[in-house]
Design a protein with these regions (language model features):
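N-terminal juxtadomain amphipathic helix
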Residues: 1-62
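Conserved alpha-helix/loop element of class I SAM-dependent methyltransferases that forms part
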Residues: 65-84
Length: 142
C-alpha cells in the first residue's frame, strides 16, 4: 500500500442537538492506494460514530421518493419475482424504498440507525433488523 495523503483529524458526521458537544473524538482520515489501484482509508472510524445517529429520511424528499420508486420498478421489470421471494434493503432508512416493493414479496429492511427510523420502516416491511448487515444477524432473524 502506498500512502496518498491525509485529510487530517476530522470529526465523523454527527447530528448534534443544540448546545451539545461532539460525542466522539476526531479521527485521522489517511488515504492509501492499494496494489489494485483502489483508494482506501488506512483505518475505518468506528461504525457507530457514523451511523448511530442519522437524521436523513428518504421519504421527505419528492425527488428521492421518485428515484426509489423507479429503482423498484426497474428491478421488478427485469427480475419477474415470484410470491414470497425475499427483498432485502440494506440501509433501509425510513423504509421508503420498501414501500414501493410489491406486497407479494417478503420485505426485510436492515439499518443500524437508532430507533428514530424503526417505527417508520416497520410500516413498510415484514421485518426490520436494526443492526449492520451480516449473515449471522440475518440468520438470527429467521
Amino acid at each position: 500500500m502506498k500512502e496518498l495523503f491525509t485529510l487530517g483529524d476530522l470529526y465523523v458526521s454527527d447530528f448534534l442537538k443544540e448546545d451539545e458537544s461532539p460525542r466522539h473524538l476526531p479521527t485521522e482520515l489517511k488515504l492509501l492506494l492499494d496494489d489494485n489501484g483502489a483508494v482506501r482509508l488506512e483505518k475505518q472510524p468506528p461504525l457507530d460514530t457514523m451511523w448511530g445517529r442519522y437524521w436523513y429520511r428518504s421519504g421527505t424528499n419528492l425527488t428521492m421518493r421518485k428515484e426509489l420508486s423507479d429503482i423498484v420498478s426497474s428491478i421488478t421489470n427485469i427480475l419477474k419475482l415470484k410470491d414470497n421471494e425475499l427483498w432485502i434493503d440494506i440501509a433501509a432508512n425510513d423504509g421508503t424504498l420498501l414501500s414501493y416493493v410489491p406486497s407479494n414479496l417478503i420485505k426485510i429492511g436492515i439499518d443500524p440507525a437508532d430507533d428514530s427510523f424503526k417505527k417508520e420502516s416497520e410500516k413498510h416491511a415484514d421485518l426490520i433488523i436494526q443492526n449492520y448487515f451480516n449473515a449471522d444477524e440475518f440468520k438470527k432473524s429467521k
